């Protein structure tokens, strides 16, 4: 079902509630990465161009007690957003009550207001996280229409997304629209061949994604720590490599079901220690020494995966190929990132998290069609699950 987008709404003279994802990393009260704020600008600027009043809100971190509030205020975000927009952003240091209501009433067309961290409502009974109906209704009463642009929390049913949408006409912002188009497109209607590359440490984190993508993709390439559970399932020696022993039978079943659709590494970069200072070397995937552990894919696997990618029309990548944070074991992730970035005739998508960070670190971000802003949300979307934050947006 097609969802309404912000361009479907009449915004002139309207109080537009906008759920943004301003959950940015902070250190000593300063924002260390403003990507999420920048990502929300197109939606905010469109609302202002249409002479709407933009009332923004977001969560920031987890807040369970009064002490947790320390360093979790959105005030620094308001200051940064003001710089990026080149206009004042009124900050209201509360989540409800007369001060907020008065500030909204006094807001003029084309003005912006940001109110305090929605998770401050979690201190007394988790009202935000448990989607308290009264809170959703109250927030909805502050506006005329609702725009949800926070894909990063779309897999959660909270008062600030589902709660408001249950009470008010709602639409997707431009960022949410893009996520639905690209991440949803992989699941619903990909251009073929579709190749999925999945990495990361644990099979358990990606089981649902692997199972779903095996029914959708033409090839699923597996790297990262979870490969060793698959190798063990094939009876290969994996030495001291990461193993989820309770998932070996499951991996066996997936291998049987997948046939040659699932492609595993043919070599591994191994070391005796989980350290950047220890000696390391490359061995065949079926002969990892008993006293060593695999920490990356080797060059032969990079070449194999690069070959499997040729001719792909859609590529989705989620999860690093090795211990990316240690430079000796980052080559696999870099190699795969380069191989995808060099594809000229494919829609290329990164499903958030560490892979997105890797692409940005390597300066390849602009070579990808889409880099998702939501780690958990994009994983659940790729699993084929319905996301409450998306489902609750009004249908066209």
From Swiss-Prot:
The UniProt keywords, alphabetically, are: ATP-binding, Cytoplasm, Glycolysis, Kinase, Nucleotide-binding, Transferase
Instruction: Report the record's disulfide bonds.
Output: none
Enzyme Commission identifier(s): 2.7.2.3
Which CDD domains does the protein's record reference?
Answer: Phosphoglycerate_kinase
One Pfam family assigned to this protein is PGK
Q: Which HAMAP family match?
A: Phosphoglyc_kinase
What does the subunit comment say? Monomer.
> Cross-referenced PANTHER family, in alphabetical order?
PHOSPHOGLYCERATE KINASE, PHOSPHOGLYCERATE KINASE 1, CHLOROPLASTIC-RELATED
What name does UniProt use for this protein? Answer: Phosphoglycerate kinase
Q: Which organism is it from?
A: Listeria welshimeri serovar 6b (strain ATCC 35897 / DSM 20650 / CCUG 15529 / CIP 8149 / NCTC 11857 / SLCC 5334 / V8)
